[in-house]
Amino acid sequence: VTLHLLRRAAWPLLGTCLFGLAAAAPATLTLDTTRATPLPPTVIGGFNYGNWMPVVEAQKDLRSVAPTLLRFPGGNVGDENDLTAANFVPLKSNLELLTTGPKPPALMVQTRVFGGKPGAKNAPEDAAQAARDAQAQQLQVAYWEIGNEPDLYSVNRGDASWTPERYCDTFRAQRQAILKVDPGAKFAGPAVSNTGDGAVNFLSRFVKNCGDIVDLLTWHEYPTDGTRSDAEALSSVSVIDRDVKRFRALLDSQESNPLGYTRHTPLGVTEYSLSYVSARPRHLSDQVGALWAAEATARLAEQGVSVAAYFALQATGAHGLVDLAGIPRPTLYAFQQLRHLTGEGRPLTSDDPALWLHAAQEGALLTVLATNTATEAHPLSTALPGYQLIGGKTFTEKTVEEEDDMVRLPLGATLDLPARSLTRLVYKRQ
């Protein structure tokens, strides 16, 4: 009887041990070398910038992410303030401070559309003057974005006259005025505030009436308000996949875009962050917000978006890579990792659903970004046929809290990816 009881007791223990071994099995990587997607530089390192940002005080950190595009003046500031010649002076200085390569970051400039008060400089001739002012500073503007979040003019700003049709008329008028100054100018819009039903309706009606003249269709992504669970917040990154697909289809449909369906207009996300509530640090200046931002950026690049600008570069409430005091946030570390995702994207998958994976080939080097979304470490087999692992760095919430450098990982057949971490692995083609 005693032996029988011992055997019965041993079976659950043995099962637990076997389950533990199975759960601890390293994830394996599968790289598809037959498909390649060019990764636009103006997605990987794009940011919203405003003249209120003390760039000079944090230039070392901000240069470390190698900005590739700046959207100016960034957010609601463009709705509430005139765009004057004086605005372009600090912009030019900070553009020079943030230049890390042979060329400065590309520039997107928002024109003023919403008036809000008598005397506001939001007429077509004011947009033309802004173009002349930019030329006077020898600034090369890649895109003029006409206004900012016009879907909210009637909702948050109390002016019901701002329909999509009125915005389209304004877009045409400002565009025509700027083209007289700069015949090669390109134009972006409508920069709707989100992808809820109201904003999507606004964007769709804009496309129907202005699809023939918009050169970059833009919208903003803010899927949460910072109050969801961490798991729900991270999973909201799926909106990127959904929205890129549906807006590409919208533009290419003759029914939805009767005036411009043959143009294959590029896509742009000119503001994005996990939460839209600047006064609430949760899911903006924490690790979850950083992991979401990195994943959203990588997905935008891989899925064919041409321009993206994270909100924001610096010191905008809880938004920004560093705060007003110059203290780094997790998003700084995330974009330091992302800057290396250059060249051609290669599909990379694993058998661990907790891992987000991306790969980019540039010459003989393959860069892999691996995000562990789980709250515990997950093992990863580093083997990739035809490649040799030559380097690895990661960061966690603790890394940021202690303001440490990235954690250098030992090179081995298996790596433990820390909980809620973003790891960069570098391989060399054999």
List each language-model region with its residue ranges.
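Bacterial N-terminal signal peptides that target proteins for export
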Residues: 2-13
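Non-catalytic accessory regions flanking glycosidase/transglycosidase catalytic cores in CAZymes
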Residues: 24-145, 151-196, 208-213, 252-264, ...
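Short, solvent-exposed segments of well-ordered alpha helices
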Residues: 82, 231-234, 284-287, 291, ...
